[in-house]
């Protein structure tokens, strides 16, 4: 059974791409066959977070336009058996792809026998969002415990429901317990109360994420990382 999971946020800079990479790696480490799809056309980043930027030959738009076969564009991550990346086009804009084409692409990936297709959704609610959610079976919404990020997440949850995707899982990213205790940061309960969705996981603010991301090695692979442990738990809950 194949499943397409879109990772979205509304607000940029909350850790959506990092979350996508960690979920994808986490699933692959559990023995699953996974494709990470970067749907942020014109602003691709997932390849850098995964440390695969030097191996790109073809991209998502090349596949859709028939310049290459899907199999040619998929980059196998040699560190994790069963993990592949389909990068976004860097020199095109989001209008190069339609929701129908994205839906067909997801089906074609499913037909190749992949168990999970993780789509890294661009920030915002325009064409890129519509494309990313078109083929999705369910959604993960990433937010940080800030008023502006939570408000944007609320808007995204409404738009997901309008697109037929209900009950998204919520990830609260970069939580600092010391700030919550001082009353300087929203608690997980505060966020949950506002958004009224199930919390899939809480990722603590952890400098390991910055270090591992810069190395192109997602935190989920780090045994002693607090964020890595959180991502491993999130992965198990998603399965």
Regions found by a protein language model. Give the residues of each.
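Conserved beta-strand scaffold positions in the cores of enzyme catalytic domains, especially
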Residues: 4, 85, 199-202
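Walker A/P-loop NTP-binding active-site region of P-loop NTPases
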Residues: 4-69, 116
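P-loop/Walker-type NTP enzyme "switch/lid" segment
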Residues: 39-111, 210-215, 220
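Solvent-exposed alpha-helical segments within well-ordered globular domains of core cellular machineries
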Residues: 25, 58-62, 72, 100-107, ...
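Helical mechanochemical/support elements of P-loop NTPase systems and associated helical scaffolds
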Residues: 42, 56, 66, 70, ...
């Amino acid at each position: 059974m194949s499943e397409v999971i879109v990772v979205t946020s509304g607000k940029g800079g909350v850790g959506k791409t990092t979350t996508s990479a960690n979920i994808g790696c986490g699933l692959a480490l559990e023995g699953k066959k996974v494709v990470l799809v970067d749907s942020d056309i014109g602003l691709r980043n997932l390849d850098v977070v995964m440390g695969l930027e030097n191996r790109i030959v073809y991209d998502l738009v090349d596949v859709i336009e028939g310049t290459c076969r899907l199999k040619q564009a998929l980059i196998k991550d040699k560190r994790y058996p069963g993990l592949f990346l389909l990068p976004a086009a860097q020199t095109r804009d989001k209008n190069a792809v339609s929701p129908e084409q994205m839906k067909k692409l997801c089906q074609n990936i499913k037909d190749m026998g992949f168990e999970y297709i993780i789509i890294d959704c661009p920030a915002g609610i325009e064409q890129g969002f519509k494309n990313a959610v078109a083929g999705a079976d369910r959604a993960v919404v990433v937010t940080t415990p800030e008023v502006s990020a939570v408000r944007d997440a609320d808007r995204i949850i409404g738009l997901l429901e309008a697109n037929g995707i209900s009950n998204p899982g919520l990830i609260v990213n970069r939580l600092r317990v010391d700030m919550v205790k001082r009353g300087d940061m929203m608690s997980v309960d505060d966020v949950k109360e506002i958004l009224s969705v199930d919390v899939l996981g809480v990722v603590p603010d952890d400098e390991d994420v910055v270090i591992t991301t810069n190395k192109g090695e997602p935190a989920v692979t780090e045994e002693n990382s607090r964020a890595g442990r959180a991502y491993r738990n999130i992965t198990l809950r998603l399965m």
